[in-house]
Amino acid sequence: MYYTRENHKRFLDKELTAISESYLKLLNTKAISLLASNDVYVTQYVKLDLKKNDIGADRNVLGSGQLMLRFKKDKGIPRKNEYFTAVILEKDMCLPKNWGDTTWGKLRSHQVEFSEVHCVWQGKTDDNGFLLCGFSGISLEMSQYLIDNRLEGCVIILGPQEPPMEYYQNLITVISNTSPDYPAKEILDFDKRNIVWNPERINSNSSQVDKIVAFLNSNNELVFQGPPGTGKTHLMAAIVARLITENKSVLVTALTNRALIELAQKDSLKEFLIQKKVKKTNVSADELISCKNICPVESKQITCMPGSVTLSTFYNASGWAKICYEEQPFDYVIMDEASQALFGMIAACKNLGKRIIWIGDQNQMQPIILLSEETLVRNDYGMLANGFQTLCDKFDFKSYILTESHRLLPNAASLTSLFYHTPIKSVADFEYQIDVNKLTFATQNGGCSLIFTEMPIGEKADRSCCSYAIDIIAEILSCHPKIYISVLSKFRTTVRMLQNCFVSRFGGLNNVLIDTVERVQGMTCDICLYYIPNTMMSMSLEKSLFNVATS
């Protein structure tokens, strides 16, 4: 075997230590200092948006069941898609004047309720000096607490998101099991060899489902590579629908809840939603409303029923994988976003079911690792960190690549093809709508444009340069006010400045997103502006990051 289990455990231990130390540093920092650095926000609870169209159309409402909070404009606001732990504190501790030298960790000991949330829209209020922001992901428990106690107007503190330490602890348990008949053993104990990656080319049409399901009737593993916009979620939903029809039990696991909900909302699964055959762990208030027929299930209890699909994140499924290996309860396990899975999680799928489909793209974002590049190289941990890449390079499983892009027009598709060993063909069913006579920087038939400007060396968040980028967005909006635009950058500090420049001019718009590249993989928009500051350019131009940003 290439890696001993002890080597694998050492990698996970080191990464868990790095995560723990980083979070411990935050816990031991004075809460008032985190407030000053915009790592903590003091907000006022306005309401829970439990009805569709409950908010004006000028605000970016990505569904309903959202938590609406009021912010002081001069204190800054979160960036869209930024994740937090929302905390309700005991009365005396809800105001910063009572915090003194209290650390964030000590302040959390005064909480009466909490939930992970993330910001999905920003907008102006009628009150001078205040802004409204909307948050998705609030737990059903915290939602019920706010409603039952009629807490409109109370203070809610937003603080650092808790890291997935239990996920790493689960994977350590998974890879430490040395039982001779252990299902994950087949993946974990691979030998040193190189396989030529040569997947069969297919499209995402539903006609492919017969061939895929027939193959899985006599084989246990299948790997899909899905370049940007090639319809992998559409195809995955069609496969799941077929398996439910055949009375199979299916688990779909992904890194994010967003990916799972996108799958559940596909047309192929609508009938099964109504029949309560689509189940999900850790359903949030907004998910329960935007996907109203989804069936919430207990996260600690493995829910496996013939003729149904269970949706669960890596975080939760890893906990199941460490205890259910003797049964392999599911008939089929489908891992979405597999390119963002550690190798231990790739292997854990074998514990969960008898037949496995891994779907990812090794040319897009890899897992986020806190260990330094030097540590990864020196200890030869790269293959353990980039699990899907290792699966494609070291295992001779049947593989497919989706080669038709529904998202990109021909020029853009041909540029994206540069990242792949096979051409990506555009089958987009829309026309190029940009007025090149008014927007001189736009290309004639789509594709990429380069816009140069003077930038100070070493500055990630230069206000004048960020304002220039927003000027470009303003020019686009003046010609095409309804077009969907993403403004992306590698660095959080850059994104914060871009958001400040945008919000001060436009407030919150439902068709403009400003975020880091890492948070938007799989998203579709009409125009993407990728801002590359004049510092650490190798990071902004890293191959997989650049592919995501420009595709």
Where are these regions (language model features)?
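Hydrophobic anchor at the beta1->P-loop junction of P-loop NTPases
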Residues: 224, 252
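Accessory interdomain/linker segments of ATP-dependent helicases and helicase-like nucleic-acid enzymes
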Residues: 1-99, 473, 488-493, 500
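Conserved lysine of the Walker
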Residues: 232
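Conserved helix-turn-beta segment of the N-terminal RecA-like "Helicase ATP-binding" lobe
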Residues: 258-288, 501-509
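Hydrophobic positions on the alpha1 helix immediately C-terminal to the Walker A/P-loop
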Residues: 235, 239
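Inter-Walker segment of RecA-like/P-loop motor cores
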Residues: 270-317, 515-516
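Pre-ATPase regulatory/linker segments immediately N-terminal to the P-loop/RecA-like helicase/translocase core
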Residues: 2-20, 72-217, 273-293
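Conserved helicase motor core of SF1/SF2 NTP-dependent helicases
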Residues: 246, 254-258, 315-318, 326-335, ...
